[in-house]
Amino acid sequence: MTHCCSPCCQPTCCRTTCCRTTCWKPTTVTTCSSTPCCQPSCCVSSCCQPCCRPACCQNTCCRTTCCQPTCLSSCCGQTSCGSSCGQSSSCAPVYCRRTCYYPTTVCLPGCLNQSCGSSCCQPCCRPACCETTCCRTTCFQPTCVSSCCQPSCC
């Protein structure tokens, strides 16, 4: 994992461009940068998703939108999936299925990390407030909205 390691749940020692951690049990690396790079959603610019558990990494991207990240065979964006999601590895914004500490949800086409349509729920790493039928959350700092969705979403 020379270009990309999982982001951090807790502060840990960092390389210049890469955090190395198993979130709940952070481990240090041999070389530390002078300015810590480990933040809840920080690493290299092309790999900035929070995680709750170790994330498998590709060349320049982590796919870590949930508590149990999935390895992908090719580089995908934050709202895309690849072969390990059971979809094309072309990184089109298609279905992602993730298992969280809370319910398993399915992100439908067109869903963004914090903005979804009426038929889309986002995975939750911690309890999150909901809007209509859409979970709106970031893993470590859930954003509460005025109304709550069905229990199956959050």
UniProtKB/Swiss-Prot annotation:
InterPro entries: KAP. Keywords: Keratin, Repeat. Sequence repeats lie at residues 8-12, 13-17, 18-22, 37-41, 42-46, 51-55, 56-60, 61-65, 66-70, 75-79, 124-128, 129-133, 134-137, 148-152. GO terms for cellular component: cytosol; keratin filament. Pfam families: Keratin_B2_2. Residues 8-152 are annotated as: 14 X 5 AA repeats of C-C-[RQVGE]-[SPSTNQ]-[TASL]. In the hair cortex, hair keratin intermediate filaments are embedded in an interfilamentous matrix, consisting of hair keratin-associated proteins (KRTAP), which are essential for the formation of a rigid and resistant hair shaft through their extensive disulfide bond cross-linking with abundant cysteine residues of hair keratins. The matrix proteins include the high-sulfur and high-glycine-tyrosine keratins. Interacts with hair keratins. Belongs to the KRTAP type 9 family. This is Keratin-associated protein 9-9.
